[in-house]
Amino acid sequence: MKFFASCAKGLEYLLADELLALGASKATATISGVNVEGELRDAQRAVLWSRLASRVLWPLSEFDCPDEDALYAGVAELPWDAHLSVGHTLSVDAHVSGTAITHARYAAQRIKDAVVDTMRRQGLERPSVDVESPDLRLNLSLRKGRATISVDLGGGPLHRRGWRMAQNEAPLKENLAAAVLMRGGWPRAYADGGGLLDPMCGSGTLLIEGALMAADVAPGLQRYGSDLPSRWRGFDRNGWQQLVSEARERDSVGRAALKQVIHGSDMDPHAIRAAKENAQVAGVAEAIWFGVCEVGELQTPPQATGVVVCNPPYDERLAADAALYRRLGDTLQCAVPQWRASLLCGNAELAYATGLRAGKKYQLFNGAIECALIVCDPIAVPRRTPLAAPTALSEGAQMVANRLRKNLQKFKKWRAREGVECFRAYDADLPEYSAAIDVYQQADGDRRIFLHVQEYAAPATIPEADVRRRLNELLAAAREVFEVPAERVALKSRERGKGGSKYGRFEQRNEIVHVREHGALLRVNLFDYLDTGLFLDHRPLRGTMAQQSRGRRFLNLFCYTGVASVEAAVAGAASTTSVDLSGTYLQWCADNLALNGLAGSKHKLVQADALAWLEAERAHFDVIFCDPPTFSNSARAEDFDIQRAHVRLLRAAVARLAPGGVLYFSNNFRRFKLDEEGVAEFAQCEDISPRTIDPDFERHARIHRAWRLTA
C-alpha cells in the first residue's frame, strides 16, 4: 500500500531517509513530501515518531476530476459508513492546482456535501463539522484533473508537539527545527558526548526539540496523550496502543539518561521566560541551561565539541542590516571554533554575512519564507582563503551576471511551487552573449549545482577573438552567480572550420549525476555528449502525462533515455513500454528505471524501429508519447523524415489507443507543418504547445510544438 507524508519544502530527502529508518519499504521524495510504500502500521508509526513530517495521509480513493460534479460523484461513491461513525465530526482540508476548480474552500465544501448526502441516503445521522478537532479529518489533493481523497491519520499538523505554552514573535515550527538539528548532526554529536548551543534561542524551540531527540522521546507522545490521533473507523487501535506502549518505555529510559549538555541564551528576558515555561511543559527543563545575554557576550560551554544551532532574526527591519549576522559569526569563531554550526538564515546574503565558510548549503522554507541553511564544520575554517585576489568581472561579464540574477529572481516562486531543480537559467537573453545555460542540481549527496553551457553559432561577420572573449565573460559570470567551480561547468563550444561552425570534441569524463524531476531520480551525463539525457523543455508535458498515467498503460515511442516512462512509472502507471532503435538509449532507460526501484515485466524495453513496431503491434495503450527526431538514418531501419512520415506515424499510433486513450505528439523541427486534413481522417487533434512551455523556455517558445490526439 502507498501513503503520502507531507513536509515543508526542502525537507523531502531528509524525511524520506527518516521514514525508511522507521521501517517503510520504500520512500520516494517528491514536491513537498514523500510517497511511501508500507502498511497502515508504518503510517501510524510515522504519525507517532516522525520529527519532520507535516501530515501523514492514508488514501481512500483516487479518480479523474475535471470539474466539481466529478469531485462530488467520486466522493459519493465511497462507503462513508465504513469510515465515519454515527455522531462523529468531520473536517476537510483541500489543496487544488492546475484544475478547473480554483478555490480550495469550495472544493472542501463539495466534499462535505457529498459525505453528508451519502450518509443521509443510507438513513444515517448527518455528521457535524468541527474544524479544530474533528473525529475524522479528510484531505483532498486535486492536481491537474486528478483527485486523491485521504484520511489525515495525525488529525492535523504534526509539528505541534503539545509542549508550546508561550512563544516570542515568528516562532520556528518544530519539524523545521528538527531538520536544522539533523543537518547539523546533533544526534551523533550527543552520542559522542558533545553539547548543544543556541545563542539566540527565542522561545527555545531548537533546544527543546534537541533535548527530546537526545532523550529518544516520540514527538507524538505528548501531542496525543491517551487519545487517538484519528477516530477513522479503519484506524488500527490495537496497533497504535502497542506503538505508544513501546514509545513510553523508550521515553522513560531516555529521559532518565538525558545529560545536561544543552545551553541557550537570548538578549530578551521575556523570550527566556517563555523558553523556560516551554521546557518545563516538555519535561526537559532540568537538561537545558537558559540565560539572558547579548550574542557578543556568549560564554564558551564546558564541552570541547558540539553543535551550534540558531535561527537568527530575519524580519524586514533586520534583513537590511547584516551587522547582527557578522557579530554572530565572529562570536562563534571565538567561543566555539571547533564546534559544528547549523544556522537557519533569512536568505543567502545574510548567510554570507556571517563570514563563516559553509561546507553545505540547503534551501528550506519556514512557512512561506525561503531560508538558507548553512552547515559549517568546523566553525573556525574561514570562508575564503584565496591564493590571490579575485579578479573583478569585466563590464560585459557583469551585464551577464545581472541578467542571471534577474532571471533567478523571476523563476524563484515558480521553481518553489513546482519543485523544479533542473532548469534553463539563460537563453541568449543578451544577443551578443549567445548561449544557453542550464542548471542541474544534484539530487543526492551535497546537492551540488552543475552548469551545462551550450554555445550558439555566432555570425561569420563577428571576429573569432570577440566570440571567445564573450564566451569567457559569460562563463565567468555564471561561475560567480552560481558559486560553481570550473570543474562543474560542462561547456559545449563551437569551433569554426570548413563547413562552418560545429561543436568541438567533448570531454570524456564518464561522470554520471543524479537529478530529480517530478519525483523521479534520473541519470544525466553533462560532459560526454551534446545532449545530457534530459530534455528540459519537455518538463511540463512529462508532468501531465505522468499524472494521467496512474493505473494506466503508458507507451513511449522514440523513448531516448526513457525519462517520460520513468516519471509515468513513479506516478503509478500500471505498465510502461519504451521503444527505441538505439541499444545505448535503452540501456540508459533501464538504468533510470532501476535507479527508482522499477524493474520487471511491468516495464518493457523494446529495441526496434518505432514506426515498423507500431504497424506490427496489436496491444493497446491508454497514454502514448511520440517525440520523434526530425531526421534519422540507420542501417537497421529505413530513413525517417518527420515532415514526410508524420501522418503515417500518427495513424499507426492512434490505432494503438485504447478507448478513452490519448496520444501526445511533439517535435522540435522549427519548419514542421502538421497535415491537419490528413490527421483529421483518423483523429481529433488539438495544438497544446503553449501549455507545454514552462517559464524558463518562454523566451524561445518554439523550441518544440505539441499536439493532443484522440481517436
From Swiss-Prot:
Enzyme class (EC, first level): transferase
Keyword Transcription regulation: no
Keywords: Cytoplasm, Methyltransferase, RNA-binding, rRNA processing, S-adenosyl-L-methionine, Transferase
Catalytic activity of the protein: guanosine(2445) in 23S rRNA + S-adenosyl-L-methionine = N(2)-methylguanosine(2445) in 23S rRNA + S-adenosyl-L-homocysteine + H(+); guanosine(2069) in 23S rRNA + S-adenosyl-L-methionine = N(2)-methylguanosine(2069) in 23S rRNA + S-adenosyl-L-homocysteine + H(+)
Annotated signal peptide: none
All residue ranges annotated as the THUMP domain in the record: 42-153
Coiled coil: none
GO terms for cellular component: cytoplasm
Location of the protein in the cell: Cytoplasm
Protein name, UniProt field: Ribosomal RNA large subunit methyltransferase K/L
Organism: Xanthomonas oryzae pv. oryzae (strain PXO99A)
Gene behind the chain: rlmL
